Amino acid sequence: MLPFWIALQFLSSLPIRLPGMPQPQELGRSLLFYPVVGVLFGVLLWALSTALMGAPLLLHAALLLTAWVLLSGGLHLDGLADSADAWLGGFGDRERTLAIMKDPRSGPIAVVTLGLVLLLKFTALVALIEQQNGAALILAPLIGRASMLALFLTTRYVRAGGLGQALSDHLPRIVGQQVLILSGLACILIGGFSGGVAVLLAAICFIGLRQLMVNRLGGTTGDTAGALLELLEVAVLVGLAL
């Protein structure tokens, strides 16, 4: 179960203590549990939404979004901000884009991007609460985290060394493909027709965003993986809310 706890520690702000430094093989296997962490997040968000039924609609959505951000510790939003700055400021140049991603400062485009993504999530949550579509609260985090597994399965990691390289090098690929298939089936089981629509929408967005990464960088980084997760989450929420 250590790979699960590694995944939960990395993807969440929950106080998880690991018994020492994980081995590279354990880091690679932790990717297999990313969709499981997504389901856990979704169940927690669904439970909170259920508890908030009867609260004013806008407050309900705001509290739900706040919990969503706090659960992940803002980790993937940080990746989205860095990627947005780098994509605009990199002017199509690979090395300049990678260098900007490592800069801890956030420029105006990062702030605007974060604002737009959070606004879209908030308004989609308002619509989904009105529709009483609780399944979307499980589907979005599940698909978002499964997309990171899919990205590492299909895309070269371009920064040598570090956590991302260990994840990429030691990911059990055949089992990873099986986990992705099971994740898709879980989405259909959870959401029915809506679950299938969410998977199709996410797949289309994934293909487009991955191609952008490959064209610019020749692969992915931790920041672009986080950006992918955030953008697929918002795509699923907005798609199901429409």
From Swiss-Prot:
The secretion signal range is none
Q: What is its EC number?
A: 2.7.8.26
Q: Indicate whether Transferase appears among the record's keywords.
A: yes
Protein's UniProt keywords contain Transmembrane: yes
Q: Which GO terms describe its cellular component?
A: plasma membrane
Example of a GO biological process term: cobalamin biosynthetic process
Which Pfam families does the record associate with it?
CobS
| Annotated family | Belongs to the CobS family.
Needed cofactors, names only, are: Mg(2+)
Indicate where this protein resides in the cell.
Answer: Cell inner membrane
Alphabetically list the UniProt keywords.
Answer: Cell inner membrane, Cell membrane, Cobalamin biosynthesis, Magnesium, Membrane, Transferase, Transmembrane, Transmembrane helix
InterPro entries reported in the protein's UniProt record: CobS (IPR003805)
Q: In which pathway does it act?
A: Cofactor biosynthesis; adenosylcobalamin biosynthesis; adenosylcobalamin from cob(II)yrinate a,c-diamide: step 7/7
**Top-level taxon:** Bacteria
Please describe what this protein does: Joins adenosylcobinamide-GDP and alpha-ribazole to generate adenosylcobalamin (Ado-cobalamin). Also synthesizes adenosylcobalamin 5'-phosphate from adenosylcobinamide-GDP and alpha-ribazole 5'-phosphate.
Instruction: Quickly give the catalysed reaction.
Output: alpha-ribazole + adenosylcob(III)inamide-GDP = adenosylcob(III)alamin + GMP + H(+); alpha-ribazole 5'-phosphate + adenosylcob(III)inamide-GDP = adenosylcob(III)alamin 5'-phosphate + GMP + H(+)
Its Gene Ontology molecular function terms?
Answer: adenosylcobinamide-GDP ribazoletransferase activity; cobalamin 5'-phosphate synthase activity
Give the stretches traversing the membrane: 31-51, 52-72, 109-129, 134-154, 188-208
Its record classes its membrane topology as: Multi-pass membrane protein
Q: What is the lineage of its organism?
A: Bacteria, Pseudomonadati, Pseudomonadota, Gammaproteobacteria, Pseudomonadales
Q: What is this protein called?
A: Adenosylcobinamide-GDP ribazoletransferase
